[in-house]
Amino acid sequence: PSNGEQQSPQDCGAPPEEQDPESDLSEAQDEERQVEQALDDALEELEEEEEQYQRLRQEELLFQIKDEVEGMLTAHREQMEALVEADSGREQGGRVSRRTRITLRAIAREEEAVAARATKVADALEAEGVLVFHEIVRTVEGDLVRIVRDLGETGGYQSGARVQAMQQDVENALTWLQEALEEEMQRREEEQQEQEQEDQQQQDQQQQDQEEALVPDAAELRLLRKLEEDLLGRVQRLQDLHPELEDPEAELDPLLLEELTRMAYQHQRIGELFQQFRQRLGVPDPD
């Protein structure tokens, strides 16, 4: 270039203006906060989705169990009616006719199928840690196994009051279970509606703990109390029907002894369940 031309600083190779380090740090911190906020939002969304999934899974499981219990109850009631009819046609004190044996075997097969369904329901409840509901279904399963035995050759083709009473116990237990499941599903539905109306986003820890369980402790304890009251009533009725139980030297019928053993085991299990709830809830043992 000629001597008369002037060069700009850039043309002369002058260094560019330096940026403020504090400004760079501030921008980096802002970006970091934005990233952290985005991660927190994503995590919160995932937690909400997980809670929603668990709630829907439990509702579906409750519905399936309730549906299965209703099916068991319907099938069992049909066999109760069939047994009453079969027993009414028997000759008292006589040999069991071939026709009656065939009928009792058919009833036994159906009751055995109900017992198999009870096994699956009990396994599902046990996996969810539902103590009392699981115990009820296990008891139903055991009673049905005894009924099947008594209806067959091993049990002497029984069809009278004792077997029918055991069938009644099964019906009562399944009915209580059905009602308790309906109440729990209704409670969940009402709770969900209240949350939607209030636009409630968070629950305190106690509510969260309760929602994690398929059935809350309060519902289980109510059913456990009902079991205890029913057992006490059955024991009293058995004592009224068999005054010989008051005589320590009386020779008791083997079937009566089996019934007493059955009731004693149920009483033991109820006590053990109450103990488990005391430990779970941190309630001290009674003096």
Predicted regions and their residues:
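Mature extracytoplasmic or organellar-lumen-exposed domains after removal of signal/transit peptides
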Residues: 1-287
